[in-house]
């Protein structure tokens, strides 16, 4: 699989207080494509960030129900991947920010 398809597979990193504490344990969270599988997520992270992945956990996050001007709708369903890296590897999302 070429690298441009890997960039389509990984939507965006999840940067919250909870995922920041997970990053201390070498775990990073990403929103991924809804058809993504563990093996393809592992290959994509290794190709994009040049790191060694130890384990991948995938969760389906159901969209919340919201009300807008009296009309009830739902947010989109998402798929979240929590990637565990090997000991000597890490991903720096904030690198270069001054």
From Swiss-Prot:
Q: What is the name of this protein?
A: Large ribosomal subunit protein uL23
Record's GO cellular component terms: ribonucleoprotein complex; ribosome
Tell me the organism.
Answer: Rickettsia felis (strain ATCC VR-1525 / URRWXCal2) (Rickettsia azadi)
Q: Which family does it belong to?
A: Belongs to the universal ribosomal protein uL23 family.
The record's PANTHER family line, in alphabetical order, gives: 60S RIBOSOMAL PROTEIN L23A (PTHR11620)
UniProt entry tagged with the keyword Glycoprotein:
no
NCBIfam families to which the protein is assigned, alphabetical: PRK05738.1-3, PRK05738.2-4
Kindly give the InterPro entries that the UniProt entry links to this protein. Nucleotide-bd_a/b_plait_sf (IPR012677), Ribosomal_uL23-like (IPR013025), Ribosomal_uL23/eL15/eS24_sf (IPR012678)
The alphabetized UniProt keywords are: Ribonucleoprotein, Ribosomal protein, RNA-binding, rRNA-binding
The parts of the chain that form a coiled coil are none
> What does the UniProt function comment say about this protein?
One of the early assembly proteins it binds 23S rRNA. One of the proteins that surrounds the polypeptide exit tunnel on the outside of the ribosome. Forms the main docking site for trigger factor binding to the ribosome.
Kindly give the Pfam families that the UniProt entry links to this protein.
Ribosomal_L23 (PF00276)
Q: Does the keyword Mitochondrion apply?
A: no
Q: What does the subunit comment say?
A: Part of the 50S ribosomal subunit. Contacts protein L29, and trigger factor when it is bound to the ribosome.
GO annotation (BP), single = translation
Which Cys pairs does UniProt list as disulfide-bonded? none
Gene Ontology MF terms = rRNA binding; structural constituent of ribosome
């Amino acid at each position: 699989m070429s690298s441009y398809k890997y960039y389509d597979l990984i939507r965006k990193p999840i940067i919250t207080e909870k995922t920041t504490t997970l990053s201390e344990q070498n775990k990073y969270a990403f929103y991924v494509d809804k058809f993504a599988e563990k093996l393809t997520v592992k290959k994509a992270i290794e190709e994009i960030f040049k790191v060694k992945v130890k384990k991948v956990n995938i969760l389906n996050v159901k969209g919340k129900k919201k009300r807008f001007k009296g009309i009830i709708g739902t947010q989109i369903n998402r798929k979240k991947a929590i990637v565990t890296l090997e000991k000597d590897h890490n991903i720096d999302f904030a690198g270069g920010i001054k």
